[in-house]
Amino acid sequence: MIEEKQEKAELWQYIEKHRAQIEKSLREHLPLAPPKIETQFNEAVEYALFSGGKRLRPVLTLLGAELFGGKAEIIMPAAIAGEFIHTSSLIFDDLPAMDNASERRGKTSLHEKFGEGLAILVAIGFLNASYGLVFVNHANLPERAMLAHAEIVECIGAAGMLGGQSVDLALAKGAGDVSNFENESVRNLKTSALMRLSLRVGAILAGASHLDLVTLSRFAELLGDAYQLSDDLIDLEEDSAIFGDAQKTFAINEGKQTAIRQLQNIVEEAKRILVENFPPSEARSCLLQLTDYLAQRKA
């Protein structure tokens, strides 16, 4: 098992240090409608974005930048792009045509509270706002900003969020299966794409090399697999009965112990990639601790 000495700051200290700055930046860049045409749109935007959440994606962007010497205060506008896209994906995921979920994070889902039409508009608003966060706010680094902008396009597209959602729809209808982890990784397209986006945007804006970005992408994909598999294990632990006619997952098909072993293998491989390819730093230490957290989290 790969271990690393504790560095200057623990993961949770790092998150707390940047939490206020993240929340401030989220509020400063809300995709709000002008007062003249505003109805309930702005209320729905705030409801969707400030309904809880760990702000994992902004933290990943900051860590991705700091891994290559970037500064949080410079990267911050771009750091919230992943959170906007993540929020949009949750809204779409809950819609009647998708998962038809009535709750999200213990609260009424957006389409249940504000209506399906407004929920779709809010989701599109978050996606649209994410582009400007990297391009407009980092115009002084045009080449890097363009590369970061391209990351958003890829994340949202068929190789990422849209593709992942289409896989979810197919699995819900009984097409395909997740009886092996290769198929499960396809199911995780949305999760892994957002992890990859968050880390790579920060790294790109900090000047990471192409080779470093390739390595970081592999780590991000493993992080996404670990996050999704731990989610499935949490669901399995909370109430296995709910899966009677629901979408099958690797954890359900293969059993809890097999899934736990698979999760441990993913975590160790992700940590190995970090340790072997990036020098010791606060950012690396926090990413290692985050990887361990995903293997141990209960909610």
Predicted regions and their residues:
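Mg2+-dependent prenyl diphosphate-binding active-site environment of isoprenoid biosynthetic enzymes
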Residues: 31-273, 283-295
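N-terminal amphipathic/basic leader segments beginning at the initiator methionine
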Residues: 1-30, 299
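Short helix-capping segments at alpha-helix termini
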Residues: 277-279
